[in-house]
Amino acid sequence: KAKQTATGIACLNNNRQLMIAWNMFSTDNDGRTIYASAWYYPGFEYPSGLKYEPTADFSWCATQYQGDGSLKDWLEISALFPYTGKNRDVFHCPEDKNISLAKERGWPERVRSYSMNIYAGGWSGWPFKGDQMWKIYRQQSDFRDPANRFVLMDMNDKSINAGNYRVHMAGWPNNPKLYRFQQDWPASWHNNGCSFSFADGHAERKKWLHDDTINITSDPQARNVVISPDNPDIAWMQDRATRPNPGWQQQNWVLQWTGAMHLKPWQWWGYWRMPGEVPADSLSPKPTYAD
């Protein structure tokens, strides 16, 4: 128990150090927040010879990086890496012993345990798929209540992927029967708890209360929806992830197919709703636009 307490404290300290780096990046970039994800995939060539989204240079984590020992170590691509003093240790929770594929590839441990709230910076600055109605915090000044907007969290090793954690907002604020997980699950290695850091710089641990949060019941990579009605953990994350974006329907976002995102160099590269995907706004009651 004493060892778990010590590793839990170390994890919270990692979160605080990463938030210092996060704020330093914003200071150097006119108050902009770093992107939660971008695509970096050398095996795929975009038009004009680009092998990655230009926004990868401004992303917390680039590419479909599982964090489990890919052939290339993507950690140093992170735009936060130099702001941590190139300290690799702060990206890894000492309680994260679940190395999965890394062990098969000869790695002693996964190099990244944390993922970033997709709404804190977005995928290259944009909402992911059907999330157009939800606010993306692109500037530090966008956070009206920074102490209650999480930025980083421990992510389950079976679902850690492209750098971000997407809280599914279906059911917010008052229809808990629609709560669900899809692809992304939080970690629970801190005695069924998870570390979070927030936009004001503080870090805290959340103790999970529901079995669906602790035990993954579907292959995350299959992107299946797991309905988890009345799950208080989902309610807790939704309350701290984002809020509706007023006037989102009037912002003229082109709803492009995800797979065509590389065909045109938009100001921000990113994901839009795929054909046939159920939009998030149809899953929730009409929200109030509170901060």
Region spans (language model):
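Short, well-structured segments within or immediately adjacent to enzyme catalytic domains
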Residues: 7, 11-291
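C-terminal juxtamembrane segment of a hydrophobic transmembrane alpha-helix
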Residues: 1-5
